[in-house]
Amino acid sequence: MSITATDLYEDGPAAGAKAKILLIHFDGAIDAGAAGRIAIGQMLRSLHNERVATFDADTLMDYRSHRPIVTVDDWVSSPDMVMPKTVLDLVEDDMGNPILVLHGAEPDAHWESFTNAINDICKRAGVEITFSLHGVPSGVPHTRPTPVHVQATDASLLPAGGAKITNHMQFPAPLSTFVQIRLGQRGIGGLALLGAVPYYMADTGYPAASSALLTSLAKFADLSLPCLLYTSPSPRDS
C-alpha cells in the first residue's frame, strides 16, 4: 500500500502556523549527554507552544525499538500505556518569534515519506532554514567552555572561523540529518549544531552542552531563548 504525506500525520490546533525556522531533535539519535533533548525540553517548558501535527506512530515506529511504557499497580496493568510519539509544535521565543519544533521519538520506517510530509508542512509554513541539535562525544574537559561545531547542508551557511573537529567524517545518519539533507535538496538549507560533551559525561545528562546549543541557536537564528541551565558539578569534582 502506498503512503502519502498526509497519511502520516494528524493536524493540531496550530496546523496553519507560519514560521521561518524549523528546529529538529529526535530522541534515540546521536545525542551525547542528552544535550539536544535537554535543550528542547527547556524550550518547551519555558516558552509558549501549540501542537501543529502529531505523526502516526503505528506507521512510523517499530515498537520493538520504541516499546510502549506500561504501568503495573498491585499486579494490575493500567490501560494507559505511554506510546512513542513524534510531534511538530509551534513555539514562540521570548520576543514572540515563531519556531516550528519537530521532536519526540525517532521514526524507524518510511523516512522518505516522512520527509515529504515535513517538506509539505515547511512549504506551507514558509520555512527558510532548519536547525538540529546534538551532543557529540569529545575530548573537551568539563572545566572548559563547551565548543559548538557546525555542520551544514551548504558551505555558504558555515560561519567563518568556526570550530571544526575534522574535515572528513562518515557515520550512520540520524533522521534529523536525513531530513535536513533532503530539505536542502529542495531549497531549504540546514545547520546541525553539535555540542561537545566530555567522553566521561556522554552517558549522563550534561546541561552545559545544552546551554551552549541554545546559545548558538539563539545567535544563528536571531532568537531570544532560555539559554541558561543549571549545571551540576561533575562527579570528578568531588
Report residues per predicted region.
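N-terminal short beta-loop-beta anion/metal-coordinating cradle
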Residues: 2-104
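Acidic, glycine-rich active-site loops and adjacent beta-strand->loop/helix elements
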Residues: 27-29, 61, 105-108, 135-138, ...
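Hydrophobic/aromatic beta-strand patches that form the interior of the parallel beta-sheet core
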Residues: 53, 100-102, 131, 189-194
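Internal, conserved structured core segments that host functional sites
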Residues: 97, 105-156, 179
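Catalytic cores of processing enzymes, dominated by hydrolases/peptidases
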Residues: 139-220
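Conserved small/polar residues in nucleotide/adenosyl-binding loops
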Residues: 230-237
